[in-house]
Amino acid sequence: MEAPTSARQMRRLLDAVLSIGAQLDLATVLQRIVEAAQDLVDAQYGALGVLDDSGDGLSQFLTVGLDGEERAAIGPTPRGLGILGVLISDPRPLRLTDLAAHPASTGFPANHPSMTSFLGVPVMVHGRVFGNLYLCDKLGGGPFTDSDETLCVALATAAGVAIDNARLHSRVAELVLVEERDRIARDLHDTVIQRLFAIGLSLQGVASMSMPGEMSERLEEAVDELDTTVREIRSAIFELHSTRVGRSSLRRAAT
């Protein structure tokens, strides 16, 4: 009979939850989740697959345990087939002693390290699958345990909360940025453009007076430059407003 989760393991879980919850940037949260999962269950390799908008494949695949060269040698980001696809179609914890023995196994691509034991856990946000944690090859040999699965499920629950919190923070920051754009646009239009326009009218009035030709030409050049500046500011205002249109969804922006 397997030993229950120890106090040491619970402390590691608490540390992992706190480290994830302390982050506000979603990209950082996602990377920290997979790092924490790998450390928590003593896995040699870990990954977090983020589902795409259709929910049928992966849009992002974060890994630990592989260096940059090894990751690049494997090739494109997995699409969510084989064992990875099992958790996508059936989002429940999956623990395997030997990956290759599972009927859904399709083997590994070229240059992929050999992996044997496997633990997969879905990460839910508001009752919907956001992605899946994949852990492979428990350090020291042997399969992942019941305790490992329990710890990983608990971590995934905390991860869902941290992801939701980070997405909310991103949305708030985005709204603040939009409001700041609007404020800048109003200031440019209501204050800066009006002042430049008034200065331009004054200079035109002075240029129409009788004065040496050189001075009149310089005033006309100044008026032309002010006109150009006003047009550029109006273009900038248009750009500030247009950036609000067609913004991507939180999942696409975050991943």
PLM feature spans:
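Coiled-coil dimerization/phosphotransfer module
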Residues: 2-31, 35-40, 44-47, 61-62, ...
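Hydrophobic residues embedded in beta-strands of well-ordered beta-sheets
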Residues: 56-59
